[in-house]
Regions:
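Signal-transducing coiled-coil/dimerization helices and immediately adjacent hinge/linker segments
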Residues: 173-206
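Regulatory input/activation interfaces that engage signals or partners
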Residues: 3-9, 13-151, 155, 159, ...
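Signal-transmission/dimerization alpha-helices at domain junctions
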Residues: 150, 159-180
Length: 206
């Protein structure tokens, strides 16, 4: 793929996206970040984001969509074993771990999930990812971007190539923050339950 020149106004867009990224720590902040200048750099209505979870020892996916989607589609896109995610991984690996375009019509066998997306106007999906440090065959993160009737080309692939490190770092930070907050809430709830149990049994608290 031959690098395409970037217009000055687009360079400013990319700079603003990168400058805003360090403020992204929560799931809702990630969604808001991808709806501003990010859209001018990489237009999309759906983003499917995966990150390796060391507790589950697998890549766990989440979906961010700015327009409504059927629940079955949302749940299907959250699974690493779905036909679309697997086809996206295959397309990415065939491109030697560079940004790639997945076509649902061309690259995915007709299945309920892909047919539902095609009916909604989705065909092309931009995909990209990173492998775990020192483990080239294991994913660290994976991203898929789509919008209805999109025609993604080399310019869009280059845009995602340039933005990937920033997206990766922002989403990793979100995953770590959300996990820590979830663990803190679980710990607080367990402590509250324990205190309530002690009060009911009349046992003295230590």
């Amino acid at each position: 793929m031959t690098p395409q020149p970037i217009a000055p106004d687009q360079s400013e867009v990319l700079l603003r996206v990168i400058e805003a990224a360090p403020q992204v720590c929560r799931r809702h902040q990630f969604f808001v970040w991808t709806q501003g200048d990010f859209q001018r750099w990489l237009p999309h209505k759906i983003s499917i984001c995966g990150s390796y979870d060391r507790d589950q020892r697998d890549v766990v996916f989440d979906i961010f969509n700015s327009i409504p989607l059927p629940d079955a589609v949302v749940q299907g896109l959250r699974s690493i074993r779905s036909d679309i995610v697997q086809a996206g991984l295959t397309a990415w690996r065939k491109s030697r771990s560079q940004a790639a375009v997945l076509s649902l019509r061309r690259d995915v066998l007709p299945q309920p999930l892909s047919l539902a997306l095609l009916e909604l106007g989705y065909d092309q999906i931009m995909v990209h990812g990173l492998t775990r440090p020192g483990r080239a065959d294991e994913l660290e993160s994976f991203f898929m971007f789509a919008q209805p009737r999109a025609e993604y080309g080399e310019a869009t692939q280059q845009a995602l190539d340039m933005l990937l490190p920033c997206v990766h770092m922002a989403y990793q930070r979100v995953c770590v923050t959300e996990r820590q907050m979830g663990q803190a809430r679980t710990g607080a709830q367990a402590a509250a339950t324990s205190r309530a149990s002690l009060r009911l049994t009349g046992s003295p608290e230590k």
